[in-house]
Amino acid sequence: MEILLIVLGAVVAGLLCPVQTAAEATITLTGSDIPTSISIHHGTRTPTSSGELSQSTFSSSSTNSSDSFYTTTSASYTLLVGSHTTSTVTANETTLSGNATATETSREPQPTNTRPCNGYAEFCARSYGNITQVAAHNSPFVRPGNIASNQELDVVTQLNDGIRMLQFQTHLVNGTIYLCHSSCDLLNAGTLESYLKKVADWLRDNPYDVVSLLIGNGDFVGVKNFTAPIQSSGLIDHVYTPKNHSIALDDWPTLSEVILSGKRAMVFMDYEANHGEVPYILDEFTYIWETPFSPTDRNFPCDIQRPPGLNEADARKRMYMANHNLNLEISIAGATILVPNTVLLNETNAVSGFGSMGAMAGNCTEKWNRPPNFLLVDYYNIGNVNGSVFQVAAKLNNVTYNGKCCGRTTSLASESVLGRLSGKLEMIYSMIVINILVMTIL
């Protein structure tokens, strides 16, 4: 089992001078809250107390070595590694099989993990491709009363609550990338740069978290149009660049490895990504496939829709996203458009029951023999119980959700009359805009 030990507190250059052997290597890290270097050593012996730990990071994975190198110090430390367990859990009669992988039991007692990765200590030793994460559909589109809105809480609150993938749609307007839903006349959430700056700031304040971003390239513009906002926002300091342009499901690094690298922002784009031009913007469909997009069917079939033509054998080698944002078809001026079905949110985002996230997750897990990697939702903070979408993800990950987020138990449609009236004017405006857009198309 791999063990990664991280020292907490300030690390002053020159204070640590461990003797290196041929089996060791030094890695330079970035970030104010993690050490400036780590030593990696392969051996069989694992330290069982803080007195046996050096102010360096060790990885113990080889079963052939007869000894190990650990210097003695009483400095405080954090163990960045998660336990591996396999279990089947039940969410209100919905059976969910988890992501954890069983490993051989160690002969010696293991230290207890004290530092969570993405909120859970168990995630640290798991592959990025072996974790289920909740994704905010159209994360920036927070506009009370606007028919095109998909979330109620801002991006910083989303991240604080536990959202670990941010999905959004972009449009190029006069040389600037904006966050707009279908049309910038319908809902304009500002520039991509401004949004990414908030994400970059959050990453700096949370050095043990990995965040994924999924860019919807609404205008199919060239990938280089996205480099300026990524660089100017400061997100460039955190973006992950893979060693090659195709990583199989089982080949993703562990969360602790990603965290130690300092590159904790995984950036994907649905169309026009080009590894040769911009290697840190990953082509979504090379790594991830999706279930039906903009679903209106409450059964939420777990079939491959994007990329089209992907065969089952290749799909099993990739991560996958379950689109669980229920939509409603409405007709305006003879045209049909899709809007979020807010009336059924407390059922759609529920732990169990027909049309629930729990039921969908169980169906997908049974069909593909593994849970979805990403659960895409509207209004993540609404469900049948507090943090219901996070409860479903936790059960899929074989961990216990103890968060205290969000979690209203009523749908938007059942709010007070006063609450609904507060957004009435903007709703009327958005409907007028939709009418104009439809008439323009016709």
UniProtKB/Swiss-Prot annotation:
GO terms for cellular component: extracellular region. Glycans are attached at N64, N92, N99, N130, N174, N225, N244, N346, N363, N386, N398. GO terms for biological process: lipid metabolic process. The keyword Repeat does not apply. It is found in: Secreted. InterPro entries: PI-PLC_domain (IPR051057), PLC-like_Pdiesterase_TIM-brl (IPR017946). Residues 36-67, 91-115 are annotated as: Disordered. Residues 48-67 have a biased composition (Low complexity). The keyword Cell inner membrane does not apply. Residues 1-23 form the signal peptide. One of its GO terms (molecular function) is phosphoric diester hydrolase activity. PANTHER family: PLC-LIKE PHOSPHODIESTERASE, PTHR13593. This is Uncharacterized secreted protein ARB_08043.
